[in-house]
Amino acid sequence: MKSSAEKINKNTEVSYLDAHLHLQDQRLQAQLPSVIARAGQKGVGQFFCNATSEDDWTKVIALAGTIPEVIPFIGIHPWYADSVAEGWRERLCLLLEQQSCGVGETGLDKRCPVDFTRQVALFKAQVDLALQYHRPLVVHCVRSWGPVVDIIEQEFAGESAPPVMLHSYSGSVETMRRLVTAGAYISFSTRLLGRDEKKIKKVLVETPVERILLETDSPDQLPAEWMAKGERAYNEPMWVADLYHQVAQLKNINVEDLKVSLWDNGKIFTHAAASRR
């Protein structure tokens, strides 16, 4: 039987997909054309670019307008839950009505000092918008798995619900299984390229391929040993190609088959936003 990669037209080359990053970040903006070019040379063909604050929204939308490979997501990160400006929800609604955007990056983070009650209120408000406008949702979760999983199970488990992705997953195998049962996508970051990430590698092995996405979270999540060598100051989307090869090895599958599967996953995940383009 032919593999899924072999079934594709020989003239069609499937690209790597970076399922979560921040191209609007100042660390990348200074040399963004070179960053995109290097990614393209490695075969990376799509970028899910996420805002973290209201200041990012128009920047992310502008990037998507000038770089066809960029899929925009706009939202407010939990780190900024205590500094949101009045009227943010109405302004986000207006952009969602006008633009082909997903919602994110939002979520919960007990590691940061921002009041958790405010985080929950902000997260739930953005969940409501993703549901209202039927847009894909990108979730950041650190040490907050109980409330995050409860909300996803309550709001996103139905067939009519928009898709949701847990970015840079750091939870347990058991939590992953609950999320997958609820229909969520699990995105693994370039942290997996680090030597000491045994826990996350175990989760990756147990996660069904049809629910996996891969990301760099550029310019963050540079593997610690790379940073220690001083060879690189920040992460870049081109390194997602290395992550694909690592994941293919861990899952014991052909990397070309993995590219096909994850490209399909990305298309399904972003369909709600892309359908408005």
Annotated model-derived regions:
Residues 1-277:
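Mid-domain alpha/beta scaffold segments of enzyme catalytic cores
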